[in-house]
Structures are given as structure tokens and as C-alpha cells.
């Protein structure tokens, strides 16, 4: 009796180990992909539409095929023993993940191919756009255009320089203008020209105006000659 129990326990443990090994191999194939999928399986995938979403029979959430298998293996490991295959709609009495990987492994091949095709097509389109931009930019540079030359962003003002500029004394131009106008008025009053003398005394006769102009010229010449003589000394 004891020997029979021991033999039963050993046989059950060996069968459990074999089942665990099969599950591990199936999951390894699940994550690595099936590179040896046959053409008949690929045709089955194309006929059924491998890119559709699969509804989890336990929680009702939608997944793609790979995500569905991972979800069932992680979240519904116990319920999967009596689950229904979402692909062939048959009631499975064994591990659902094992059934999916063994009977419908061509789905993995198709999804892997589609992912590679999407990545390659996206990379090709991106490279095409980059080549087009580079070609257009080179043409614009050759023609002297500036459509591809962006203006550099305005640099932020240095706070130290801003404070230094604000602290500098501001010149007062009004005082300088006032001093210049005062000097000009002094010179005009001291040495009036002919037109100023004529406008200042319009009531004088023409003869008097000429004499006044001559005297003013004489005085100016005398003053200038005196200044030049002082400089020569």
C-alpha cells in the first residue's frame, strides 16, 4: 500500500514536472515568437484577421493576442483551466495558454511581422522626410534663400549689465542746449550782421543803414585783427 502511494506520488510529480516544462517552453515561444510558422497557419491568420482585439472571457477586457495571453497567465491562471479559447471558440480542458501557443502559434508570427513592418515603414517614411528636408535646405542655401535659416532666439538680458546701465548718470541735454543758445545770443548781440541790423532798425534811411553796416564791419574787423595779433604775440 505504501509502495503504491509512493509510486503514485512519483508519477504525479513527474507528470507535473513535464507539464511545467511544456508550459515554460510554450511561454518561451510566446515571448520569443515562432520563426518556424508554416504557411497554412499564416493563411489562417490572414483569413481570421490577426490584428483584431480579443475579449477576455473572465473580466471582459480587450487585448491584442500577445497581451491577452500574458493577461490570462498573470491574472486568471486558475480560471484558465476551464476557459474557452477566444480564437477557435472551443472549450479547453487544459491550460488555456498552452492551447493558444500550441494550436494558434501562427498569430505570434503575424503580429511579430506586423510590428517589424510598422517599424520599418515608419523609419522609411521618417528617413524620406529627412532626406527631403535636407535636399530642400541645400537647394535654398545654394540659391541664397533664407527660408530654412531661423533667427536665433533673443538672448535674455544680463541682470548685472541691466543694473549697471541703470546706475550710470544720465546726461542732461537741456543744460547744454541752453548754454549753446546763450553763447549764440551773446555773439549775435555783440557782433550783429547786416541783416540783423536792418531788421532791428527798419525806420532808418537807406544811407544811415549803409553807414551803420560799414561801421559794424569795421568794428568786427578791428576786433578780429586784435584777436589775431594777440595770438601771434
UniProtKB/Swiss-Prot annotation:
Annotated Basic and acidic residues bias: 191-214
Record Pfam families: Di19_C, zf-Di19
Region (Disordered): 176-215
Family to which this protein belongs: Belongs to the Di19 family.
Protein's name in the database: Protein DEHYDRATION-INDUCED 19 homolog 2
Amino acid at each position: 500500500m505504501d509502495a503504491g502511494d509512493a509510486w503514485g506520488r512519483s508519477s504525479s510529480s513527474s507528470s507535473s514536472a513535464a507539464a511545467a516544462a511544456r508550459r515554460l517552453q510554450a511561454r518561451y515561444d510566446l515571448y520569443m515568437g515562432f520563426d518556424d510558422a508554416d504557411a497554412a497557419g499564416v493563411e489562417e491568420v490572414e483569413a481570421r484577421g490577426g490584428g483584431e482585439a480579443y475579449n477576455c472571457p473572465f473580466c471582459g477586457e480587450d487585448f491584442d493576442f500577445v497581451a491577452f495571453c500574458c493577461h490570462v497567465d498573470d491574472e486568471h491562471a486558475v480560471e484558465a483551466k476551464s476557459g474557452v479559447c477566444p480564437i477557435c471558440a472551443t472549450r479547453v480542458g487544459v491550460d488555456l495558454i498552452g492551447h493558444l501557443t500550441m494550436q494558434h502559434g501562427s498569430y505570434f508570427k503575424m503580429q511579430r511581422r506586423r510590428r517589424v513592418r510598422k517599424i520599418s515603414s515608419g523609419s522609411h517614411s521618417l528617413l524620406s522626410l529627412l532626406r527631403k528636408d535636407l535636399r530642400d535646405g541645400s537647394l535654398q542655401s545654394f540659391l541664397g534663400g533664407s527660408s530654412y535659416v531661423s533667427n536665433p532666439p533673443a538672448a535674455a538680458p544680463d541682470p548685472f549689465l541691466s543694473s549697471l546701465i541703470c546706475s550710470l548718470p544720465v546726461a542732461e541735454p537741456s543744460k547744454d542746449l541752453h548754454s549753446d543758445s546763450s553763447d549764440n545770443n551773446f555773439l549775435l548781440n555783440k557782433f550783429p550782421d547786416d541783416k540783423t541790423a536792418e531788421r532791428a532798425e527798419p525806420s532808418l534811411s537807406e544811407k544811415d543803414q549803409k553807414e551803420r553796416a560799414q561801421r559794424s564791419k569795421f568794428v568786427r574787423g578791428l576786433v578780429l585783427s586784435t584777436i589775431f595779433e594777440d595770438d601771434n604775440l
